[in-house]
Amino acid sequence: MANILRKWIESDRRELRRINRLANRVDSYQDQMAKLTDDELKAKTPEFRQRIQDGEDLDHLLPEAFAVAREGAKRVLGLFPFHVQVMGGIVLHEGNIAEMKTGEGKTLTATMPVYLNALSGKGVHVITVNEYLSERDAEEMGQLYRWLGCSVGVNGAQKSPDEKRAAYACDIMYSTNSEIGFDYLRDNMAVYKEDQVQRGLNFAIVDEVDSILIDEARTPLIISGPGTGTSKLYQQADRFVKTLKNEDDYKIDLESKTVSLTDEGIKKAEKYFNLKNLYDPENTALTHHLDQSLRANYIMLLDKDYVVNDGEVLIVDSFTGRVMEGRRFSDGLHQAIEAKEGVEIQEENKTMANITYQNLFRMYSKLAGMTGTARTEMEEFREIYNMETITIPTNRPVARVDEPDLLYPTLESKFRAVVKRIQALHEKGQPVLVGTVAVETSEYLSHLLDQQKIPHVVLNAKNHAREAEIIKNAGQVGAVTIATNMAGRGTDIKLGPGVKELGGLAVIGTERHESRRIDNQLRGRSGRQGDPGLSQFYLSLEDELMKRFGGDRIKNFLQRLQTDDDDEDVVIKSRFLTHQVESAQKRVEGNNYDSRKNVLQYDDVMREQREIIYRERQQVITEIDSLKWVLMPMVKRTIQRAIDAHTLGDKKDWKLQEIVDFAVEVLVKPDQITVGMLEGKSKDEMVDLMMDFAEQVYEEKKHQLYDDSQMLEFEKVVILRVVDAHWTDHIDAMDQFRQSVGLRGYGQQNPLVEYQTTGYRMFEQMVADIEYETTRLFMKSEIRQNVTR
């Protein structure tokens, strides 16, 4: 283990030395660029573009182009990127992750690789976690890019298709991750080329890359249409589930956050719903609703996993603490929570298009990211996204003091100690940022501070609209701010006058998050750019992480403590416990990684299918002459399948009447074909005969429509209508199959292998259905003028 660690550290140092040498080459142009007039500096952009056209590559151009962007930033923004920021920029240009501590100027760091890559004309996307940051960064950094002759656009949910198209056409575009994904899906549902907004996914720099590519990796982006109504079943399931008693009727596995009925619970369900066997295949819909109701009532917590606002259930992102607007839990869980909370149950939707962030961002030709905390997830970034994580040195040494964790026996004693510490810090004027994991905790702590008459503000999912303003004031003398995980990522907490002398910003964590990275983010709010500061976590043996993963050793430890000492406020400082906390976090991180990897393996099946359908669709949409080359092979394969199906065994057993019936249904008028015309022919001869009929029908349609453009429009209408209808049905069927395939693991079958093989068969069947339906629609439809989609 020690050897592996040594090799790691050594390879890191080697990589930093290489990057440092390249940054020195950028430095070497500093004086030369400083001597240029504004016009001469601006003229570098068209010069670089010409050199790229003449064959020079971006890597060769890097030292000079970075130096131009750097000098431009000094003149336009009044900011000159430090040497370490140049190093960060090199990491980004090379398609890797730059881990830079809070306050080290990630936004300015990105300007150099953004400018260099924008010169290629293929488009650079800067991805942020919310629209506020997109607008802010595009406004501030856009001044520099425009001054240097690059166009800048902002993409947003409220933009019209024309505005979006214009933004994507720019050299540089700022956008949220979700909007890029939804635009991709909408583009692949469009029926006209002119309705599409994107122009390929070339290079993206993802800000807060861990938040988007790790925390949100499992969240699929879904475009839905209306589905079938089942709200009564949710209400019935909810009423039943609320009658159950813990341990007797259901059991909860805290570690995996799952809940299931016991044998007693199953008997109660069979009696309640008047069934002989709850798990009979006929009762699949009911068991699905019961499973979701159990999760809603006994796993999902109000004000932690979701909030209820104006009669609507809204998801709270467990990593950021923000409300996820417009998102709904999938698989009917959202409806089950609506039934639990007694609000209106919105109908389940049918998925029409979906993609995960993992597969969306892997489609970029080059992907880079920056964050203050990626090191703990470096293996995942390497394995899934093929990105290395490089830790960039800070410009000034970190002066923050990270004090060791304090552990208390109970939640109550822990919060008493937290309030006491806040009071002491507040009395001397030192600003305090208190991090909580849940909305509920932030409100409980707020209540305790009110009792002590300590003025404070709360930042959680219920008031996130004031986020930037609250965070901006969190570094002033005497400020006390309670924040859930969101803690204003992307907004620096700047220290007010006199705060440095008081010791800087004090960060107090009220419990460890299941991810070490989130804890590090909270610590990183303090001590920016060499400022002083302190951080400390207050834990209790009743914290959720300890309950889920602490195990019997901790319980025994707690019992010994309580018998040895009746004082609830005793502070436990034990290496054993600190080690237990960290190993618990590593276990959760490992579980989460396995889960994300599992999601990716399943989603890769859909990715391959999605790419085939979207590629074929795009060929149809962009065709400008004729689609006969797409249509007639579909017709031929449909004919071959039908003839193969009815010509099994000896020739005397061939079902020629069925072939005639097929031809009448799909290709020709009833009087055009008889059994006699097929007698004595081989399979290939029958296929040729049918294809002759198909050619005749095709030419007739072409003649009826007079105009080649009308014929092309008719071909597009038929193909797209059929493909879209079958594809959305297929997505829905694959979704349902994926939910049920887990049960097959009990039959000694690997659920993933089962999903892959059956999914492939389902896809092949869908393609055959599309070709059959397209053939029938095209060949048998009556032509009317004014073809519309």
Curated annotation (Swiss-Prot):
Gene3D superfamilies: Helical scaffold and wing domains of SecA (1.10.3060.10), P-loop containing nucleotide triphosphate hydrolases (3.40.50.300), SecA, preprotein cross-linking domain (3.90.1440.10). SMART domains: SecA_DEAD, SecA_PP_bind. ATP binds at residues 85, 103-107, 492. The gene is secA. InterPro entries: Helicase_ATP-bd, Helicase_C-like, P-loop_NTPase, SecA, SecA_CS, SecA_DEAD, SecA_motor_DEAD, SecA_preprotein_X-link_dom. Keywords: ATP-binding, Cell membrane, Cytoplasm, Membrane, Nucleotide-binding, Protein transport, Translocase, Translocation, Transport. Belongs to the SecA family. This is Protein translocase subunit SecA. Its EC number is 7.4.2.8. It catalyses: ATP + H2O + cellular proteinSide 1 = ADP + phosphate + cellular proteinSide 2. GO terms for biological process: intracellular protein transmembrane transport; protein import; protein targeting; protein transport by the Sec complex. It comes from Limosilactobacillus fermentum (strain NBRC 3956 / LMG 18251). The keyword NADP does not apply. It is a peripheral membrane protein. The keyword Ubl conjugation does not apply. Part of the Sec protein translocase complex. Interacts with the SecYEG preprotein conducting channel. Has a central role in coupling the hydrolysis of ATP to the transfer of proteins into and across the cell membrane, serving as an ATP-driven molecular motor driving the stepwise translocation of polypeptide chains across the membrane.
